[in-house]
Amino acid sequence: MRNSSKGQDPNFSYDSILSTPTPSARRTIGPRAPKSKTTYHKPPSSIESVSTLIQPNKSQSVTSPYVKQFTFSSKEYNSHNKHALQNSQLPLPKTPEKSTVHRPKANKVEVTDLPSSSSVEHLHTSKHLKGPRLPKNIIKSSEDVQIAPVTPPVHSRSFDPLPKPPVPSVPVSKTKRRTKHKLAPVVEVPEITNEVSPKFTSTNDEQVYRLRSIRAGSPNSVCSFQFEIPSTRPPSLDQLIHLFNDFLRHPVFDFDENAIEMLQSCTPDEKWCFIRSNFAGFDDPSFQIPELAAVHRPVSWFVIQLWNKTISNLQLITLSSLLSTQSDRWISLFLELQGLRALHNLLTYFNSSAVVQPQQAEVPRCMLTLLKKKPTLVTSNSYIFQAITVTLISPNLLPRKVAADLLTWVLSLKEPLVVSILETGFKEINAEYEKEVPLFFGWIKSFKDIILEKELARTPPSSPARNSASSSPSNIAFLEYCTSTMEFINQLIVACEELEQGFDLDILDSLRESGIHEVIQLLRNFPDQQLEKQLNIYESEEERRTISQTTHEDVDSFMSNESSILSSFNEFASNEVGRLLESTIQNILLAKGTEKQKVKLIKVFNSLLQRILLNSKVSNESFEDSLQASLNMLTERFYSDDTARNALKEAKASRAMAEKMVIERDAMAAQVNLGAEDLIAKLNKEVEDQKDVILSQKRTNETLKTEIDALQKSHVTQIQRSEVELRELYLLINSDSFQGSTNSKERIIEYLLDKLDLRKKEIAAESTLWSNDGIDDKLRDLREQMSRQSSQPSTVSTILQIPDKKFHRPFPRHLHRYVGRSASESLTSEKDESIKSMKGIDDFANLEIPGKGIESNVVIKDISNQTHEINSVENKAETVSNNSKITNFDIPNDATSLPTIITHPTPPPPPPLPVKTSLNTFSHPDSVNIVANDTSVAGVMPAFPPPPPPPPPLVSAAGGKFVSPAVSNNISKDDLHKTTGLTRRPTRRLKQMHWEKLNSGLEFTFWTGPSDEANKILETLHTSGVLDELDESFAMKEAKTLVKKTCARTDYMSSELQKLFGIHFHKLSHKNPNEIIRMILHCDDSMNECVEFLSSDKVLNQPKLKADLEPYRIDWANGGDLVNSEKDASELSRWDYLYVRLIVDLGGYWNQRMNALKVKNIIETNYENLVRQTKLIGRAALELRDSKVFKGLLYLILYLGNYMNDYVRQAKGFAIGSLQRLPLIKNANNTKSLLHILDITIRKHFPQFDNFSPELSTVTEAAKLNIEAIEQECSELIRGCQNLQIDCDSGALSDPTVFHPDDKILSVILPWLMEGTKKMDFLKEHLRTMNTTLNNAMRYFGEQPNDPNSKNLFFKRVDSFIIDYSKARSDNLKSEEEEASQHRRLNLVNNHKEHVLERAMSENNKMDNEAMDGFLDKLRNVKLESHHKPRNRSAITMGKEHLIEAPNTSTKSSPAKNELFVPKRSSVKSDLAKVRPRYPKGSESTDGLSDALNITPTKKGEVSSKAKKGYNYEKRRSGRQVSDSYVLNKNSKNKSNKGRSASYTFSDPSSLEDSNRQKPFNGEKFRRFSSKSRRGSQNRDSKKTGKARKDKGINNNQTSPQNKPSKESLKSDTISNEKKVFPQKASKVNLLTPTISNGTRASKHANEKENTFPRGVENNLVAPMIPNNTELNEDTSAVSRNLENATNDLKETFPTTTTISTARAKPGNNDINTILRRNNSRGRRRMLQQMSPLKSNKFSGTNDLNFQQATKPDGSNKSSYMERLEKLKQNSERHLQSVGGKKVYSSEETPVNKILVSPSVSILDHNRILSQSTPIKSPQRAQEMLAGLLSGKLAPKENEK
């Protein structure tokens, strides 16, 4: 057998071929029998013989001994088949060997005429479609086709016996076959109908016992084949035989005749077993599964679909893809199964069908793919091209286009057979025309009809939609079809020319006759670059072929003979033709322009003459017609400006599109590189954003729906209300009382006015809630006008009256006219005059005074008329100068001309001002009128002569053109040789020779032409080397190199801008400027920080800098040419070079470029934050609106406020801003606010409102945001992204041709732009949702959402309320806790109250009491020696080191009176050092304590200097004792000290003597200081006693005896002072040591704010009185025990106090006895005065030790100590309390006398306790002594020593 497509030998054996593992090959039953006979079980039916489809000279070569010719008819075959079915034992019918049946020839192959599946004959293939292999020899015949079957020889080893028929009960097993016997699969061509084969059905159950193929669905659907096999054996033998015959003909089997004959001889049982055992072979998934994709189908499936014509368009596309991608084996199998013939059959069916099928375009595409894979099929299967040619007139454009492309490719192979088949195809197309037409007439006519339809469907040329429609898909498909068709025509012409055979007549003439020129003319109307190219190719080819084929004998002979040309020219020279020809040549040569332009001009004339000559020779037209046609053809070829412009636009658009495609490709590649996880994460994020947007939209929709429902209800209510009003009004009018009344009209008006007022209120409320701005501005103005009219009497005269005003109209250059008018003029005349004046003024105001160097082209018309109109406005004054005023104005330096009446632009600079009278002023307008009148007569005023022009440039020798110096040396050598004869130029510039050139008028001079001698001289110069010597001798020095070496770089940029560049690019200081430019152009990530700077106005708004750097610019829009080639940018400095290469060079799109980068960076940086903030604000608004607790709290506040307010201030609601006023409403004592009361109320009575702060946690976060700033930022980003999209689509960024070649802005922006736009859409939706939610929430709470301030403060007010409420709650809780703690402390103190006096009167203290009585008697009996002496106020000299600043003292206060200052006993230093209190910063921690306790910190083994010296006072010259004590603390700085003046106290009395010697004290300062304190003390005394101190010489620390108060006055003062609290003003000179009281009642805030060392006299630690009595030595141990007990009690009472361990005082310390002994009588008297009772009590609270000495009848105030104790017991006002044997005082009372109960208490703790109390006066000295005695803490006797 021979396969024609593969070129195999006819005797080729299939033993060596391995079949593909397809189901059909795998399921072939049994081995093949030896082929000894050539019998056939199914002869093929005949097919139409087409002469053009048969390959010439190939059928005779196929000869073989096995060739036999048979021809069968369908009728004969059917009769044989039917006869065989009736006889089961007979084999299949055999065809006689030499019988032939002739069938009439048909025009077309009709598939429906084929009777059965075997009706299609397959040619040129080695395999048949059904039954045995087909014969290969094809004999050409005009009427029939003789088929000679060829049977290949069978190998001797290939015979195997058939399997025995199996037993029905035993399953039949397949016999193993050798692989070499496997054959290639054979596919069946199923029947289209089942009408031919008879159906044998059972009469009983009517069951089908036939194998048949069922086609289901439409032709386009995927069909499945179902093979019906009966489950039981057919009852009839005929049915079984028929089923068996069909079974054998199935394509899965490939039996030869011997095998079929042996199978036919089997018994019916064996046949049925054979059928049942092999039925499993039909169960092929690739055939049976309908849902299986076509790409997974086998080759045979596609072939079956093609033959059945049931293949869909998608399956054809899949087949085309498989044909281009599968292996050669797959394609070979497709060809072996007659796939190409099936495609041809299907295409023929589509061409003949009246119904347009979408698969028609895919069939040629499959053919093209197959032919490209196997180019040999073009010659072996050339019959397919006839059907493809017919496809050129398909109703659809796409099949035409694909067919044209296929034929173009085939013609490129230059196969002659193809051209002849194409001719047959075109003839078939023309078969429908009765008369004879050109070959291509039918095809070209169809082509032309399509173009005309498209032309009619186009919009008019003037329509703006025409350009937009050109890019529609239909237009693109049409243009592609036209381009493919023209390409096919051009290829057809070229192929016919190269093959030199083909069509009988000339192809170009046939195309012309078919109307190709009309088609080309129509196609010219469609602007397409590719189509234009093909049209030009055709026209050029036609022109070339026409010229080459036309014989021009006369012309050729004429042009070839030069002598004839010259003779003809000589003949014409004398007549008119010669003159015109000479004139034409002269005009061409004299034409202006360069040589290239002259060449173009000559080409135009030459082409025109050639065209005219050619047309006159070729056509028989007249000369005029030929000339007109030539001109038309020539002008059509010229490109117009519009065409060129459109071409440029298209080129730019194409380039932009290409770059966008590249960018999209890169973006897709980047997405692919992301990987699955990143891509999924990105998509999930987008889905989440979309979900958020959808949820927000749902919320918004629900809100809008609610609002719409409310509006609908309101509308219905309003309609009902209106109806009610109308009915009421109707009833009112028709009522009897109304008709009888006289004031009925007034009643109606009153009723309507009431309703109107009510409606106004309702509308106002609704507008507040819903409208944007409340009342419209226009409506508000109208209301104001009506109110004014209603308030004033409105008359016509008042309405028409126009107030006096001055008409202010600015003139050019600050030239003002003030036009006034009176109110007495009528309205009409005033209107006319104002119109005239306005017109004139506007005309004059439109003038422009040009600046320096600007041409003036403004025309002023009728200035006099304008002046007249202005004058008429000015009440028609007699003269212009009386009323018109023109202000003088300054003329800038660059303004040098006033506009004048001119008809042509004046040359720059303009002439000076014609009417200028002085330096900076203009003349009166009258003079302007004079000038205008003169110019009206003269017509044109002569202009002033222009300034002299700049010096002209160099004039070149050739043509007298001006040549710049830089170009003067660049003249071509030819021009130079013509002028000077020199052909050589110097290598470098030489010194110039200055002479007077003679370049003209040399005709009759010596210089007319060079003589022979001159030529010799010139040759000598060239050869002798003189010119070389000139080069060396007269060479000029290169100034450029010297400038480079000596001069620095040119610097145009300002220093400030250079600093900015240096700051922003400091990280890149090590890089080259070109590298920085490259990084910026490549949009490097490291340059994002500089984007803001490079796009700022400081950088861009530099006009002077740009102008200076303009010569260095590179014009990238014109191909990157330098603007000025002489300028070298390398001369510039670093930042100037950077500026010119970026901002100046790319100035056309730099702003948009940087803006794009800025928008991108901002969106990438702030998008997430903005979305989060918008969501937060929306969520906060929803939480606030939905919070029931907060709304209940607001109602509670409303009810409380309405309860507090009067009736006028009652409210139904309040704004959120009112919450901020709650902390400002205080109670009567100003201690608590309404917010404190609200907290208490909520905690006691409304606990459900207590926990509203956590519900509003989001509101607290939203309060930190600025809503207005967020809205503005979001709007700017959205607007910026939209502008960026516009710039990339049609703006500055849409044309990449003007970009820098290295600029990658589009590659960065475009991939991101889609994502950025999507983000901005999301952000826009979030912003809209936020605004909607917030506005609804604000309206819900009664706020104004249109007020930006209210919107910004909405959440902040709520947050402020939450913070204030939390503070109030904390204050309440703290106050309650302190009250509870104080109550507990009071109970503890009250428990020990009764034990105080008992301990004082106990026997243990008897000796102490007696000693005290003796001590008091001694004091009273002291003789006052020097009281009569005048008090000397000499200065006290003290050292600065003894002055320390007392904290918290006032400058106006004086030391407390009635104080006895006692020096302290010394303590043990070691115990004190262990527990030292903390002191404020800036003061030494131990100074005050050491001084107070007489402790000096010393190093180990040293003795204190104070202990060595002893604390002894020395009597001063003045006789005054200044101080008896020293102060505890030095200067302590605290917050409470701010603003208070420091008071100075004496630090250590014992060191006064040494300090006086070292550094004298400023006595004058001290006197002023003491006098101020004293005056302050006197003022306080005078307020209480009504008496002023008379003795001003007494020290502030003592009290005069005259001022001692009585017992009753003290009692009344004490009671009255309990109601008032006055702050104490401490003295400047605090000479007391601090005292401590346990009964301090402190305010809670004072404890936190007061200093560690509180101000006041109570800070002084007062030591107990230690009398110098020797009897007390015995009781030292008892005193120590009492001291320890008191210390322990204090520890229990004040557990936080720091205890200082006590010890015996060292001998030598001074006590009160020593001081009294050493002092004079004056000091003793002062002691006695201080022991007097307390004079007055200024402060509230009960005196803790209010000792008041009883006055005896004799006037003396002496009493025993026991008497005073008895009175102390009886006094009810003395609330002495006993705490463990010591005296303490009630915390509810404010003590006047702070008494140190235990010296072991820490000084710091004393101050802490005292800081909680109200400052009061210090106690008396005697009271302090008594308190010390009562507490049992008497000093031991060692103090005296």
From Swiss-Prot:
Alphabetic keyword roster: Cell cycle, Cell division, Coiled coil, Nucleus, Phosphoprotein
This protein's record includes keyword Ligase: no
Highest rank taxon of the organism: Eukaryota
Start and end residues of each stretch annotated as Disordered: 1-63, 78-134, 152-181, 1445-1661, 1696-1715, 1735-1758
Listed GO CC annotations: cell division site; cytoplasm; mating projection tip; medial cortex; medial cortical node; mitotic actomyosin contractile ring; mitotic actomyosin contractile ring, proximal layer; nucleus
GO biological process, one term: actin filament polymerization
Compartment annotation: Nucleus
Modified residues (Phosphotyrosine): 1544
Ranges in coiled-coil conformation: 674-715, 1260-1290
SMART domains documented for this protein: Drf_FH3 (SM01139), Drf_GBD (SM01140), FH2 (SM00498)
FH1 domain ranges (all copies): 740-972
Compositionally skewed regions (Basic and acidic residues) per UniProt: 1499-1516, 1554-1567, 1605-1621
InterPro entries in alphabetical order: Actin_filament_regulator, ARM-like, ARM-type_fold, FH2_Formin, FH2_Formin_sf, FH3_dom, GBD/FH3_dom, GTPase-bd
Ranges of residues in domain FH2: 980-1391
Keyword Nucleus annotated: yes
Polar residues bias (residue ranges): 1-25, 46-63, 1447-1456, 1483-1497, 1539-1553, 1594-1604, 1630-1641
One GO MF term: actin filament binding
Residues with Phosphoserine modification: 1541
Biased composition (Basic residues): 1568-1577
Residue ranges occupied by any GBD/FH3 domain in the UniProt entry: 232-620
Role of this protein: Plays a role in the cell cycle. Involved in cytokinesis. Component of the cell division ring. In the absence of profilin, caps the barbed end of actin filaments, thus preventing subunit addition and dissociation. In the presence of profilin, nucleates actin filaments that grow rapidly from their barbed ends.
Family: Belongs to the formin homology family. BNI1 subfamily.
Quaternary structure and partners: Interacts with profilin and actin at the FH1 and FH2 domains respectively.
Identification of the protein by name: Cell division control protein 12
Naturally occurring in which organism (per UniProt): Schizosaccharomyces pombe (strain 972 / ATCC 24843)
